[in-house]
Amino acid sequence: WSAGTKYGAPDNRTIIRFGEPFTLMSNRSADPANVQFSLPTMYHSHFWTAAFADLNYGKAAEAEQSGAFKAVTEAADKWVRMGVDGFRLDAVKHIYHNAYNDENPTFLKKFYDRMNESYKAAGGEGDFYMVGEMLDEADKAAPYYRGLPALFEFTFWYKLKWALQNGIGCYFVKDILDVQPLYAQYRSDYIEATKLSNHDEDRTGSDLGQSAEKMKVA
C-alpha cells in the first residue's frame, strides 16, 4: 500500500458497511483480520465445489428480488447511462452451479430484459446488445438463447479449425448450417457471434501451426 498503509482496524468491533467511508489504517501492525463486513452472506454463495457460483442471487425464478441482482444491475445502469449499448458476459454457464439446467438461461433473461429496459429508458435505439460466452458445443450452448440474444460461436471455431488443420473443407458449411435449427428452437432472432479462439483456448496461430495462409483463411 502507498505510504505504508494497509487495511486494518483498531479492534474487532470495527465493521465495514456499504456506503459508509472507511479509513485505511497507517499502522502496519494493524490486524486485517479485525475488519468485519456487514451482512457478508447476502451476496456470496458458497458451494465449496471445484466450480462454484460467485454471487448468491437466490432462486433463479426470483433472482430479480435478491440484493445481489439489484446491486449488479444498478452498477450496470451507470454504464448504460454513459452511452454503452451492449455487454459481453463472461462465463455465463457459471452463474448458477449447474450449467445445463434452466437456471442460468432463466437468470440471463431477467438480466437482459432489465438492461434492455434501462437502455430504452436512457434513449437507446433498437434493443440492447448482449453476447454471452458459453464455452461448449452447440447442443449445450443452444438453450442459453432463451436468455440472451447472442452467444459466441465456439462450435464454428471447432469446425473451422478441424477443416483447416486437415485440409478438408467439404463438411464445414453443412456443419455450421446444421446447428442453426437447434438455435432457432430457443430464439427465432438468435445472433451467432462468430469468433476464432479466445483467451480460454490455445490461440488461433498456435492451433494452425503459425501458418500465415491458414490464418488468413480463418
What is the role of each PLM region?
Residues 1-70:
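Glycan-binding loop/region signatures in secreted carbohydrate-active enzymes
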Residues 1-25, 74-77, 85-195, 206, ...:
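Active-site-proximal helices and loops of the catalytic beta/alpha 8
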Residues 59-60, 204-207:
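Surface-exposed cleft-lining segments at the edges of enzyme active sites
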Residues 62-82, 212-218:
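Short, acidic/polar
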